[in-house]
């Protein structure tokens, strides 16, 4: 009933409002077009067009069918290529989770453009997670690959890792903050008087990592790095920021960096993917990162001088 030729004929008549114009578009005779529409209406048992001497217009049923017919025809026409892609070992869907520290909208768009050109029938799902939330997505939510898991050792032996680099940290506050000119190192008693601004770990199953905060100190939780930086600039609170993200603000004296009793060590981050069952799209992403290709350079900017 809904073979490709019938769908093309129905769509052409609906879009042109004329059997003769549809015939011209499809290089068929008007009689052929009219017969196919008549047969379609007989098979469905409903009138799809109102006919006049000058034009044909869709009935309510015809309007509904038109909405569906375009999708069906597109699906039928793409199916041979989709089947070939599956046969070649290409995934139907790839879920990618990205660490909040490495998340860069332009870098994500560039990677997706590269992938979509090569794998037009693969569905790509991008998620942004924080700290152990990245591992959580890999271990418990079926994600295929992670850009920026914490550490350089896998939490399960079913994953492979490639170290990407280490994030260097600076303890910062606004230039006009009351602690900005106090003698270093700042004491815990001095620090405890002011709120710590943090981004909460997004892990749902794994134990959340606790960001920097002293016992008894007020904590302000914000949703992302952009808000955390803005909060520090506004003098809302104190805390650690990646050096590469705050260096320009330190240079122009919007922020100041101070020494505290326990400085945050560098945070190593890695690419992680499943050892078994990965398809060609994931393999290509891994190659982009292991070869440090330009297509993924935006994800590595936070490291300053990423491994070459």
From Swiss-Prot:
The record's annotation in SUPFAM superfamilies points to: Periplasmic binding protein-like II, Winged helix' DNA-binding domain
Question: Residue ranges of the DNA-binding region?
Answer: 19-38
Which PROSITE patterns does the annotation name? HTH_LYSR (PS50931)
Any one Gene Ontology MF annotation carried by this entry is:
DNA binding
Q: Does the keyword Signal apply?
A: no
Name the keywords, alphabetized: Activator, DNA-binding, Transcription, Transcription regulation
Task: Tell me which family the UniProt entry assigns to this protein.
Answer: Belongs to the LysR transcriptional regulatory family.
Name the UniProt record assigns to this protein: HTH-type transcriptional activator AllS
* Source organism: Escherichia coli O1:K1 / APEC
């Amino acid at each position: 009933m809904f073979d490709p030729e019938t769908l093309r004929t129905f769509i052409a008549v609906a879009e042109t409002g004329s059997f003769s114009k549809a015939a011209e578009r499809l290089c068929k005779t008007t009689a052929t077009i009219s017969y196919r529409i008549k047969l379609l209406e007989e098979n469905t048992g409903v009138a799809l067009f109102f006919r006049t001497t000058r034009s044909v217009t869709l009935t309510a049923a015809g309007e509904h069918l038109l909405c569906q017919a375009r999708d069906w025809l597109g699906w039928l026409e793409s199916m041979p290529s989709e089947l070939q892609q599956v046969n070649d070992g290409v995934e139907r869907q790839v879920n990618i989770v990205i660490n909040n520290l490495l998340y860069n909208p332009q870098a994500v768009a560039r990677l997706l453009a590269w992938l979509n050109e090569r794998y037009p029938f693969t569905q790509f799902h991008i998620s942004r997670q924080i700290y152990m939330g990245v591992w959580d997505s890999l271990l418990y939510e079926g994600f295929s690959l992670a850009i920026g898991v914490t550490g350089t050792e896998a939490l399960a032996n079913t994953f492979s890792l490639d170290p990407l680099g280490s994030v260097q940290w600076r303890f910062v506050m606004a230039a006009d903050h009351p602690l900005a000119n106090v003698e270093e190192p700042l004491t815990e008693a001095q620090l405890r008087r002011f709120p710590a601004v943090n981004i909460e770990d997004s892990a749902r199953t794994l134990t959340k990592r606790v960001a920097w905060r002293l016992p008894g100190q007020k904590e302000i939780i914000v949703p992302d790095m952009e808000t955390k930086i803005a909060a520090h600039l506004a003098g809302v609170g104190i805390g650690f920021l990646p050096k590469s993200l705050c260096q320009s603000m330190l240079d122009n004296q919007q922020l100041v960096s101070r020494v505290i009793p326990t400085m945050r060590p560098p945070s190593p981050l890695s690419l992680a993917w499943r050892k078994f069952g990965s398809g060609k799209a994931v393999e290509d992403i891994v190659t982009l990162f292991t070869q440090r290709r330009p297509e993924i350079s935006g994800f590595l900017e936070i490291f300053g001088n990423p491994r070459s």
